[in-house]
Design a protein with these regions (language model features):
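A cross-domain feature marking catalytic cores of carbohydrate-active enzymes
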Residues: 1, 30-32, 49-54, 76-80, ...
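N-terminal pre-domain/capping segments
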Residues: 1-71, 253-268
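Histidine-acidic metal/acid-base catalytic patches
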Residues: 3-14, 70, 126-130, 134-137, ...
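Acidic-and-aromatic substrate-binding clefts and catalytic sites of carbohydrate-active enzymes
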Residues: 5-10, 25-38, 51-60, 80-87, ...
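A generic short-segment signal for beta-strand/edge and adjacent turn/coil regions
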Residues: 15-20, 76, 90-92, 106-111, ...
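Alpha-helical scaffolding segments of alpha/beta enzyme cores, especially the outer helices
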Residues: 15-19, 35-38, 42, 61-68, ...
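Hydrophobic beta-strand segments of well-ordered beta-sheets in folded domains
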Residues: 26-27, 45-49, 72-74, 105-106, ...
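Active-site acidic/histidine proton-transfer and metal-coordination neighborhood
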Residues: 46-47, 51-138
């Protein structure tokens, strides 16, 4: 919702979150911005936190700042693309220890320009974390980054990406950014309100991913937070000639909700 509806006439946080609530959203993903925390509380939205850091001395302060605005689950983009696994492991261990001491649940995001920017680096970190702690690494999954790294196509999204069901089922935060093998974000609509062929190609993967998570979380009360993440023009994810990313995010939310209801109805 950055620069929404335009850079010159950007809405206040309160108005943005009121619109999110009206559109059916249950939560807001945000950095530790006090105004967002207050608006989220006003509109009854769960706060999911965020920060990016590769410096262990910053972790406690960042976690506390996120806790202060109401976040319990906190997404962390950890370190840099040239951070090697031994250093990344040390940082992840400290991050989780700091989070536990504060009663928080941080999770390491799979993201470019971090220590998890490729599947190989991400799974090496997860393997090392499991070896040291005996526990699965808490992860925020964003498969759009892995898809472009591996140059995938709709026919092999699930085969190539859903290779660690235990880590997927352990996770509670997912970024459902529609993608293909060339673009980490594709438009959801064609500018006239119709779903794009590219989104339709991606939706079966979204269903396979949700099914995978549900298969490991039957008869539990664990929460799942799915963000239909459509980045704005300001961040470079969206392009100026494509439909507005926030309006597209609303459409993606509806499509994901349809899939969720289909899968959970089958379980009963």
């Amino acid at each position: 919702m950055v620069d929404y509806p335009s850079r010159k006439k950007e809405w206040s946080y309160d108005r943005k979150l009121a619109d999110a609530k009206a559109a059916g959203f249950d939560a807001i993903a945000t950095a530790a911005i006090p105004e967002v925390g207050r608006a989220a509380k006003k509109h009854g939205l769960t706060v999911l936190g965020y920060f990016s850091s590769g410096k262990q001395e910053e972790f406690a302060g960042e976690l506390k700042a996120n806790k202060k605005i109401g976040a319990h689950h906190i997404n962390v983009q950890l370190a840099d693309e040239d951070t090697l696994t031994p250093e990344a492991l040390g940082l992840a261990l400290i991050l989780m220890q700091e989070g536990k001491s504060l009663g928080l649940e941080p999770a390491v995001e799979m993201h470019r320009d971090t220590c998890t920017e490729t599947p190989e680096k991400a799974y090496a970190l997860a393997d090392a974390y499991l070896k040291v702690t005996g526990e699965l690494l808490p992860i925020t999954w964003d498969f759009s980054h892995f898809a472009i790294v591996k140059h995938l196509h709709p026919g092999n999204y699930a085969e190539k990406l859903l290779v660690c069901p235990d880590l997927i089922q352990r996770a509670q935060m997912f970024h459902f950014r529609p993608f293909n093998g060339h673009h980490c974000q594709i438009p959801a609509t064609d500018g006239n309100g119709k779903l794009t062929p590219e989104l339709k190609d991606w939706l079966p993967f979204a269903e396979a991913l949700l099914k995978c998570w549900l298969d490991g979380n039957r008869n539990t009360n664990r929460e799942l937070f799915v963000c239909p993440e459509m980045g704005p023009v300001a961040s470079g994810y969206n392009l100026s000639t494509l439909p507005n990313s926030w309006e597209d995010a609303k459409v993606v939310r509806l499509e994901i909700d349809k899939i969720w209801k289909k899968l959970t109805t089958k379980r009963r």
